[in-house]
């Protein structure tokens, strides 16, 4: 499974979802790779120190002689590895302009891993540019985090249009796993209303699991840990493990 975590809006829990879904998959004994395609590198520094990152996804994608395997680093969590990002990744789109295979760079690099990882999770940048398209072309599945806030559905049409364009030609096998509602505060009427709106737009694509707003989820990256080791008894850990279970169920349901 190669799952891209994408939403063109920032602040929707995209990186938190990528980090903790990857960790949950690894904890199930599956060798898992987290690929950071966001120049902000928040997924990377959720597990690694800056000074440990010598080469990044920029090098692996932009340089023909650099393999993805050359940049991958282990984390303290067994079975979890990271292909880290650096701020230089922001220059990649300009670097690849005009290259005929620009949309296939990541897909080709992943192919060189020869199935070493059972699961790959890709943290996309909050934009619908070349980096996100590379992730969608490489992925088998797409997961969309959506915060239960007033502007939750803003830009949804653009995202769905991009997904459809990718499915029409470069990656017809791409499947939308679903939409997960994040940072949900069930105490507020607004959050409940937005949740209903998301269900109206996406219907059965919405995961049953809802990620509640939880301070532990915000704190864990500062300690270079996933929520499962930082606060294993927290609501955040329960929610993300439940999401992982649902993801696996949906993937298996479509492959049997």
Label every model-predicted segment.
Residues 1-256:
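P-loop NTP-binding core
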């Amino acid at each position: 499974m190669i799952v891209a975590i994408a939403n063109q809006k920032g602040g929707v829990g995209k990186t938190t979802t990528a980090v903790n879904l990857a960790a949950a998959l690894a904890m199930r004994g599956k060798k898992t790779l987290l690929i950071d395609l966001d120049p902000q590198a928040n997924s990377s520094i959720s597990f690694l120190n800056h000074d440990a990152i010598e080469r990044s996804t920029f090098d692996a994608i932009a340089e023909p002689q650099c393999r993805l395997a050359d940049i991958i680093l282990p984390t303290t969590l067994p079975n979890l590895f990271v292909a880290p990002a650096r701020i230089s990744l922001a220059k990649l789109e300009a670097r690849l302009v005009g290259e005929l295979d620009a949309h296939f760079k990541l897909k080709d690099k992943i192919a060189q891993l020869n199935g070493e990882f059972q699961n790959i999770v890709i943290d996309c940048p909050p934009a619908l540019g070349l980096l996100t398209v590379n992730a969608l072309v490489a992925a088998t599945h797409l997961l969309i985090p959506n915060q239960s806030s007033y502007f939750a559905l803003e830009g949804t049409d653009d995202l769905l249009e991009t997904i459809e364009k990718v499915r029409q030609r470069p990656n017809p096998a791409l499947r939308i796993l679903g939409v997960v509602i994040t940072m949900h505060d069930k105490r507020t009427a607004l959050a409940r209303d937005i949740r209903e709106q998301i269900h109206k737009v996406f219907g059965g694509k919405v995961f049953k699991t809802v990620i509640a707003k939880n301070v532990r989820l915000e704190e864990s990256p500062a300690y270079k840990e996933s929520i499962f080791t930082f606060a294993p008894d927290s609501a955040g850990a329960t929610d993300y493990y439940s999401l992982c279970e649902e993801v696996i169920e949906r993937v298996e349901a479509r492959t049997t």
